[in-house]
């Protein structure tokens, strides 16, 4: 396909019969690509490798860099930039038509393994090597591999070994600076007697790789459903009333200062004009909390609805709480606060969730504490998202929503104390 001398830039293309979701090309009589449409039928489509001349790159790379720096286009494929570029006609890029079965694209390891049996046992992949060792099987016995939706911290994929499915967690970029995996492992060991977590098959404190059992008949919590709320809060009550003691504390002030330092030490600007004022408010909340005697027990801290797993067993659903990487000793009401802000609850919804958890009407101190942790949680995850966004991740409006919690619930906290 490639030659010693290539006179022009080109994109490989294969003919697609019938309807396709591939990127279809329109060309001039001389083969210059003049338009790209996402999806089409009975057309040549972008498929396989691409070649750029130095002259093309000299003009194209600045445009590509500008699109990457722009929030509205940062998450695009690089071909989106090309799509806009070809309409101008300069510099030129041509179609490189390939015969049928000349070019293959592989979207996953499973597709590659189906095409070339060599990769069934020689994937050259760290996760596959690990699974092979953990289960004492050849890589060819690891099947049905598919990616799961990426979380906000990690990526995971599903696989099957000996007719049973498992999940392998791969820590996301930069998480080694954010997560203490030894503490996470200790959290699982501490909470094990309650039998409320996912079943862990393998955990590596150094790499953060984790393999756990996949529950076939399961779903995540829906916090707009009052019955799901009740079951999730019942599990949190069970956790908190056990009064488990971990060797690791979740100190929200320390975490706030830690993430702030991560942002500023990497030359990142915190993009809020009133940041210093809001931070001062958060320090006041921390002082208020420290002046109030509150219990400290093992708490989950990352109590987003997706971490409550409803597993069907016969005619009942058993609730499990997964992913304990942020857990530590803390005020149990921090778990309720995190449930609220992760679910984007308003004040009325948050008050109701607190009632469900306590199984009674909260007192003034409990309302004030909930609002304080909602504000502090919002502030903490704002800094977390700012840092992660500078690592190349995109959280849409999440950062703004969390910052709004910090601002609003500071005032709600103070209003309650004045009552």
Language-model regions: role of each:
Residues 1-73:
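Conserved core of the sugar-phosphate nucleotidyltransferase
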Residues 45-130:
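Conserved alpha/beta core of the MobA/IspD/sugar-nucleotide pyrophosphorylase nucleotidyltransferase superfamily
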Residues 92-199, 208, 297, 311-319:
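Conserved NTP-binding catalytic cores of kinases and kinase-like/nucleotidyltransferase enzymes
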Residues 110, 116, 120-123, 383-419:
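ATP/Mg2+ or Mg2+-diphosphate-binding catalytic cores
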Residues 126-141, 244-301, 305, 311-313:
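An alpha-helical support segment within catalytic cores of ATP-dependent transferases
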Residues 146-253, 260, 264-277:
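ATP-binding pocket architecture of kinase catalytic cores
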Residues 309-335:
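Catalytic activation segment of kinase domains across protein kinase-like and atypical kinase folds
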Residues 333-362, 375-393:
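Active-site activation/catalytic loop segments of kinase-like enzymes and analogous catalytic loops
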């Amino acid at each position: 396909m490639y030659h010693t001398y290539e006179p022009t830039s080109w994109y490989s293309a294969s003919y697609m019969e019938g309807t396709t979701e591939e990127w279809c090309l329109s060309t001039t009589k001389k083969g210059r690509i003049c338009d790209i449409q996402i999806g089409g039928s009975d057309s040549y489509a972008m498929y396989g490798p691409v070649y750029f001349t130095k002259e093309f790159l000299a003009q194209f790379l600045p445009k590509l860099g500008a699109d990457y720096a722009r929030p509205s286009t940062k998450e695009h494929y690089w071909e989106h930039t090309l799509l806009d570029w070809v309409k101008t006609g300069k510099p030129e890029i041509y179609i490189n038509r390939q015969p049928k079965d000349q070019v293959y694209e592989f979207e996953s390891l499973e597709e590659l393994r189906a095409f070339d049996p060599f990769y069934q046992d020689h994937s050259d992949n760290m996760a596959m090597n690990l699974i092979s060792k953990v289960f004492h099987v050849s890589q060819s016995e690891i099947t049905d591999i598919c990616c799961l939706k990426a979380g906000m911290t990690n990526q995971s994929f599903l696989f099957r070994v000996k007719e049973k499915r498992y999940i392998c967690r791969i820590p996301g970029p930069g998480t080694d600076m954010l997560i203490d995996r030894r503490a996470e492992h200790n959290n699982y060991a501490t909470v094990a007697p309650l039998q409320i977590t996912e079943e862990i098959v393998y955990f590596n404190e150094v790499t953060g790789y984790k393999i756990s059992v996949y529950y076939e008949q399961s779903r995540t919590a829906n916090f707009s459903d009052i019955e799901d709320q009740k079951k999730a809060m019942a599990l949190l009550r069970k956790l908190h009333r056990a009064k488990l003691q971990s060797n690791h504390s979740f100190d929200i002030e320390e975490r706030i200062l830690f993430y702030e330092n991560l942002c500023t030490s990497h030359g990142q600007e915190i993009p809020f004009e009133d940041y210093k004022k809001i931070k001062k408010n958060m320090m006041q909340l921390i002082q208020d909390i420290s002046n109030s005697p509150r219990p400290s027990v093992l708490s989950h801290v990352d109590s987003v609805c997706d971490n409550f797993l409803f597993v069907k067993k016969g005619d009942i659903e058993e609730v499990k709480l997964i992913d304990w990487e942020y857990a530590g000793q803390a005020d149990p009401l921090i778990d309720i606060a995190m449930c609220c802000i992760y679910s984007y609850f308003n004040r009325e919804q948050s008050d109701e969730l607190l009632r469900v958890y306590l199984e009674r009407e909260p007192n003034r101190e409990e309302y004030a504490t909930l609002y304080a942790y909602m504000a502090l949680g919002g502030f903490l995850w704002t800094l977390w998202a700012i840092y992660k966004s500078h690592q190349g991740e995109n959280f849409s409006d999440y950062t703004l929503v969390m910052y709004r919690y910090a601002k609003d619930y500071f005032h709600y906290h103070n209003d309650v104390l004045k009552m």
